[in-house]
Amino acid sequence: VGYFIGLLLSIGSVMLGESEGLVNDLMGIGIYGLLSIVLLNLSLIINDKIILSKFDIKKEIFDDKNVGTGVVEGSNAIATGLVVMGAITGEGYGEAGPIVNVLIYWILGQIILFVTSKIYNLITSYDIHDYIERGNIAVAVGYSGAIIAIGNLINNSLAHDFDSWMITFQDVGFNVIVGFAFLPIARLLTD
């Protein structure tokens, strides 16, 4: 379900602006839809190999029926869908072109989601990977909330008209720093 939500967010973002005619709109949906599918799948591979590398996600989901791992996998797809949505939504792009902008934003988003994962694990009194592997759904939901929240902050930072890379990185940096500052506060309030 998370994968399809991420896909809807990213592909649906093509239709948020004004119409450029039926043919151009369909071409945009096709190009960005294909790009979204590729980026979502790459994100899941990154999630498997880098972010949650302490256990085998496919084994946890398919063999062990670990709901918590499925929740985390879905939240990664939703967060990535939000990042791609923000990247596609804004008008204008740098000299490199719109596809390169989306790719740079996606890479930036993946780095931030990785850092979020590390910070979240540091601010908890337990190893989230261990508890997720053991099937603790509450830990998975808490972690997923953080990942999706940061993905939403990235989305809001990117979903504006492109002025310059400096302004974009400042917007993303400010929002992410605020998000990182609130992560421990949210953990404290919910615990």
List each model region and its residues:
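Membrane-interface segments at loop-to-transmembrane junctions
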Residues: 1-2, 57-73, 128-143
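A generic, lipid-embedded transmembrane alpha helix
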Residues: 2-16, 75-82, 144-156
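Transmembrane helix-loop junctions in multi-pass membrane proteins
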Residues: 11-24, 83-97, 122-128, 152-170
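Membrane-interface helix-loop-helix junctions at boundaries between adjacent transmembrane segments
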Residues: 20-39, 43-73, 89, 95-100
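Alpha-helical transmembrane segments
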Residues: 24-41, 94-112, 167-182
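Membrane-water interface of transmembrane alpha-helices
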Residues: 34-53, 107-124, 181-191
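Alpha-helical membrane-protein topology signature
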Residues: 45, 68, 138, 165-180, ...
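A contiguous, surface-oriented mixed alpha/beta subdomain in the mid-to-C-terminal portion of proteins
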Residues: 102-103, 107-119, 131-162, 166, ...
